[in-house]
Amino acid sequence: MDRRAAAVADLERRIGHTFADRKLLELALTHASVGDGAKKAGDNEVLEFIGDRVLGLLAAEALAERFPKAKEGELAPRLNALVSRETCARVARGAEMGPALRLSASSSKIGGRETDSILAGAAEALMAALYRDGGLELARRVFLDLWAGEFDLANQGKPRDPKTALQEWAQSQGKPLPTYAVKDRKGPDHAPMFTVQVTVVGLDPVFAEGRSRQEAEKAAAKALLEREGAGI
């Protein structure tokens, strides 16, 4: 058994489910960067789209059960925190999904297995695959298990926007405001992927990816803050 196959088997043990549809699991773990030369039959973009909705339903349901007297305005920021890209990436790391992913050689070489956008997308795709393979009850069980440690963090409310935090930090250092530039756009129109560069005078620029320009800018701002030891 090769290293990736072992990682996939470990992931199934970790979530407590062996997929009946092996192609479905493989699809959920295949990133769009994998090219035709790697015998790709598809990637996880559509499953990611479905998984985002499955995750939203399960998170909303779980919050409503935990806080039966809470109003919509109180639940909304908690829901946003539970389904955020940062949270999904953290959950994927906790489940050790990275080694199980199929990436292009170039994406793997530059650390794609630890990239928030790739990990978060894989976590969403996995939820869709679980829903399709075993139904909503299975997806709910795995969600409650993998996201168990995230509910306390969600109760703290919505974190500061990374771009706002970076702007405030730059000003506190006596620097001009950060600048953002789109360096690349790839993928189909229904599921584009943007690469954005953020620059603060006097510092090396940082690059990040996202499914929208705004998402990529936030990811880049967050990465720069973390690199400079000023995380939000």
Swiss-Prot record:
GO terms for cellular component: cytoplasm. The active site is at residues 52, 124. Mg(2+) binds at residues 48, 124. Its cofactor is Mg(2+). Residues 8-135 form the RNase III domain. Belongs to the ribonuclease III family. Homodimer. This is Ribonuclease 3. It comes from Caulobacter sp. (strain K31). The lineage of its organism: Bacteria, Pseudomonadati, Pseudomonadota, Alphaproteobacteria, Caulobacterales. The gene is rnc.
